Swiss-Prot record:
Pfam families assigned to the protein according to its UniProt record, in alphabetical order: Ribosomal_L44 (PF00935)
Name the record gives this protein: Large ribosomal subunit protein eL42
InterPro entries referenced in this protein's UniProt entry, alphabetically: Ribosomal_eL44, Ribosomal_LSU_eL42, Ribosomal_zn-bd
Region (Disordered): 34-53
Any one of the GO BP annotations: translation at presynapse
GO MF, one annotated term: structural constituent of ribosome
PANTHER family in alphabetical order: 60S RIBOSOMAL PROTEIN L36A/L44 (PTHR10369)
Superkingdom of the source species: Eukaryota
Principal location: cytoplasm
Keyword GTP-binding recorded: no
Family: Belongs to the eukaryotic ribosomal protein eL42 family.
């Protein structure tokens, strides 16, 4: 389980110094219908002849690399950058911190 705080003081390229950053998890955007590869694929798929390209079935990984999106909280900056961290099965953003010697509540 990886627990990452919602804010982080780190270097901002635009400000040129360490600033607090808001941390969110990166999500992939919607695929464009008009990208060249998609247009080519749709053109090839249309008409008779079934599936024209091989469908990938050999999945190797069970996890994805976590990518953090850091946004500078300075009002006139707001620059954003990505930061990749290692692979993990469980990722948590801003969960409560683990304390030593605490009794586990169920």
């Amino acid at each position: 389980m990886v627990n990452v705080p919602k804010t982080r003081r780190t270097f901002c390229k635009k400000c040129g110094k360490h600033q607090p950053h808001k941390v969110t998890q990166y999500k992939k955007g919607k695929d464009s219908l008009y990208a060249q590869g998609k247009r080519r694929y749709d053109r090839k798929q249309s008409g008779y002849g079934g599936q024209t390209k091989p469908i990938f079935r050999k999945k190797a990984k069970t996890t994805k690399k976590i990518v953090l999106r850091l946004e500078c909280v300075e009002p006139n900056c707001r620059s954003k950058r990505m930061l990749a961290i290692k692979r993990c099965k469980h990722f948590e953003l801003g969960g409560d911190k683990k304390r030593k010697g605490q009794v586990i509540q169920f």
